[in-house]
């Protein structure tokens, strides 16, 4: 098991979340760990499933998560990262390249982008809202607004709809 990198973000969640929401949060943390510590996907998934999801860690009780949802997000982001990053880059403003974002924000955007692309069964508004909530757990400034704007732009490109908007129908 890898130790947690120093400076690793810890969320400030005040409300209880559903198992998929917890899986999303854990996936963002795992993607952060992979980015910062260079941990591999198999190793980080095994670590989270064995020692974190639903477990007590350093006196903090991790909430129970949907392990299949967690695995799908982490593995999906890793598998599709070369496709996701250019899409995210296009959704960012010109003065904010993806490389300028911190690791946590990149993890949130990659996970949200993957879910928009791969999980058509989940409503756009749910995905955007969940990842905005995750951003709010880590940030108090403008980052949640950035997550909302970027995922909304991506939803328009990927699904032909934005948060709260109905899908466009072709005649």
From Swiss-Prot:
Q: Give UniProt keywords alphabetically.
A: RNA-binding, Transcription, Transcription antitermination, Transcription regulation
One GO BP on record is: DNA-templated transcription termination
According to the UniProt record, one GO cellular component term is: cytosol
Q: What Gene Ontology molecular-function terms does this entry list? A: RNA binding
Q: Which residues cross the membrane?
A: none
Keyword set includes Transcription regulation: yes
HAMAP family per UniProt: NusB
Entry's family note: Belongs to the NusB family.
Name under which the protein is recorded:
Transcription antitermination protein NusB
């Amino acid at each position: 098991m890898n130790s947690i990198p120093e400076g690793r973000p810890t969320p400030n969640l005040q409300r209880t979340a559903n198992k998929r929401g917890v899986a999303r949060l854990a996936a963002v943390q795992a993607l952060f760990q992979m980015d910062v510590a260079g941990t591999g996907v198999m190793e980080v998934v095994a670590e989270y499933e064995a020692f974190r999801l639903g477990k007590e860690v350093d006196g903090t009780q991790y909430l129970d998560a949907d392990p299949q949802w967690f695995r799908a997000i982490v593995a999906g982001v890793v598998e599709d990262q070369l496709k996701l990053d250019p899409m995210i880059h296009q959704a960012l403003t010109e003065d904010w390249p993806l490389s300028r974002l911190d690791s946590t924000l990149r993890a949130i955007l990659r996970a949200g982008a993957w879910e928009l692309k791969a999980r058509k069964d989940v409503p756009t508004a749910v995905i955007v809202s969940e990842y905005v909530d995750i951003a709010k757990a880590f940030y108090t400034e403008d980052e949640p607004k950035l997550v909302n704007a970027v995922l909304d732009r991506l939803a328009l490109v990927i699904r032909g709809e934005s948060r709260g908007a109905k899908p466009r129908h072709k005649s």
